[in-house]
């Protein structure tokens, strides 16, 4: 792997742990990506799609009511306003343009909450590419509005009945398909994880989130925030927010993992803080595994955070102490979901509600502290209203 164009590692994390057959395919992808990054025509087409199709830049909204009685200013980066309803659309457009550049004629993807699947389906419809989405059977059930959306836009949705019937199983099936069809097919990975060069590609195609946030907050407040906060599953919305702030040492980077029913119960999705390093999904990164190295099932109320590993750049930022990673339970996320809806008229995705919950916790801990916080509101909550309704009005998810 010494002949990759870009460094495949972040510290000791990352790499390209895939079947031999996929190594040339990943190198072809890396080559195409490096060329595209230096091609003004590609960049112009990507920028045009982001602006005129997806609706960038997204707003930076000051919360008027949530912080009443405190000295905190809390802003939300509104990725929920992006076409498709979440940050996923950003990098999907970039990857499909890359796939076309490589002459691929078919797109496959995995999805958990269905947001990446929806983003892939809408971009494939618009850019005229056939599309197959693998989704855990359990997620197909709990995210039915998104399944309908994908099918409406022409995607073939394959429910995966293996293992825990969730995101990790969908990832495995997508990998299998890709291994058999790589000559014609691009695997449009949905998060900043997996084998090199995916974590780097996804970061580069999401980093406009942090770049815009920096410009907008300087315009509004004349200074950088004290902290930016984002939810972490695989880690794409968080790395998109963090990337442009990594070199700003006065800005705290806070990633929020799902504590599920409580870390102590074992039913969570917090491998960064409560997992061990291993090889999974083509990369070396923290994973939830038992003492024999078997992957354990992660759990979160939020399908998009229900993943037993995490992107390698987050593992590295955690190791060097540049970013802080914390966890929030289902219950705390549900409370934040309701608070934002009730007090600001914005219904957030359950994923984003984890980040918001931690921001609210910080504010409550020290209401007299003057601080400027930005939460990445990575997606809208339409897809979650049935799940939340079920929990709040009897029954469980």
From Swiss-Prot:
Keywords: Amino-acid biosynthesis, Aromatic amino acid biosynthesis, Lyase, Pyridoxal phosphate, Tryptophan biosynthesis. Its EC number is 4.2.1.20. Pathway: Amino-acid biosynthesis; L-tryptophan biosynthesis; L-tryptophan from chorismate: step 5/5. InterPro entries: Trp_synth_b_CS, Trp_synth_beta, Trp_synth_beta/beta-like, TrpB-like_PALP, TrpB-like_PALP_sf. GO terms for molecular function: tryptophan synthase activity. It is an enzyme of class 4 (lyase). Its cofactor is pyridoxal 5'-phosphate. It catalyses: (1S,2R)-1-C-(indol-3-yl)glycerol 3-phosphate + L-serine = D-glyceraldehyde 3-phosphate + L-tryptophan + H2O. The modification N6-(pyridoxal phosphate)lysine is found at residue 88. One of its GO terms (cellular component) is cytoplasm. Belongs to the TrpB family. HAMAP family: Trp_synth_beta. The beta subunit is responsible for the synthesis of L-tryptophan from indole and L-serine. Tetramer of two alpha and two beta chains. This is Tryptophan synthase beta chain. The gene is trpB.
């Amino acid at each position: 792997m010494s002949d990759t164009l870009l460094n495949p590692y972040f510290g000791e994390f990352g790499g390209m742990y895939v079947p031999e057959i996929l190594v040339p395919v990943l190198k072809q992808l890396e080559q195409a990506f490096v060329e595209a990054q230096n091609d003004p025509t590609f960049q112009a087409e990507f920028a045009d799609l982001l602006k005129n199709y997806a609706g960038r830049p997204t707003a930076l909204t000051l919360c008027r009511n949530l912080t009443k009685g405190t000295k905190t200013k809390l802003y939300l980066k509104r990725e929920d306003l992006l076409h498709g309803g979440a940050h996923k659309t950003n990098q999907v457009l970039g990857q499909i343009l890359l796939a076309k550049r490589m002459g691929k004629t078919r797109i496959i993807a995995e999805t958990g909450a269905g947001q990446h699947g929806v983003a892939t389906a809408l971009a494939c419809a618009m850019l005229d590419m056939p599309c197959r989405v693998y989704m855990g059977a359990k997620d197909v059930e709990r995210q039915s509005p998104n399944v309908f959306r994908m099918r409406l836009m022409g995607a073939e949705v394959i429910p995966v009945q293996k293992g825990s019937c969730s995101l990790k199983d969908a990832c495995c099936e997508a990998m299998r398909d890709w291994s058999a069809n790589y000559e014609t097919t691009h695997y449009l990975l949905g998060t900043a994880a997996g084998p090199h060069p995916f974590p780097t590609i996804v970061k580069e195609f999401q980093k406009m989130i942090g770049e815009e946030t920096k410009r907008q907050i300087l315009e509004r407040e004349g200074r950088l925030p004290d902290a930016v906060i984002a939810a972490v599953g695989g880690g794409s919305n968080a790395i998109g927010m963090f990337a442009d702030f990594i070199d700003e040492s006065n800005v705290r980077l806070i990633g929020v993992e799902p504590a599920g029913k409580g870390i102590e119960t074992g039913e969570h999705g917090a491998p960064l803080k409560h997992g061990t390093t291993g090889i999974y999904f083509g990369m070396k990164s923290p994973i939830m595994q038992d003492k024999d190295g078997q992957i354990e099932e992660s759990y979160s109320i939020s399908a998009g955070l229900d993943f037993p590993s995490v992107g390698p750049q987050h593992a590295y930022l955690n190791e060097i102490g540049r970013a802080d990673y914390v966890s929030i339970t289902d219950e705390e996320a549900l409370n934040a979901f309701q608070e934002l809806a009730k007090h600001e008229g914005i219904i957030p995705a359950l994923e984003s509600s984890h980040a918001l919950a931690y921001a609210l916790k910080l504010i409550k801990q020290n209401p007299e502290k003057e601080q400027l916080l930005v939460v990445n509101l990575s997606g809208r909550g339409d897809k979650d209203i049935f799940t939340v309704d079920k929990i709040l009005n009897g029954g469980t998810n």
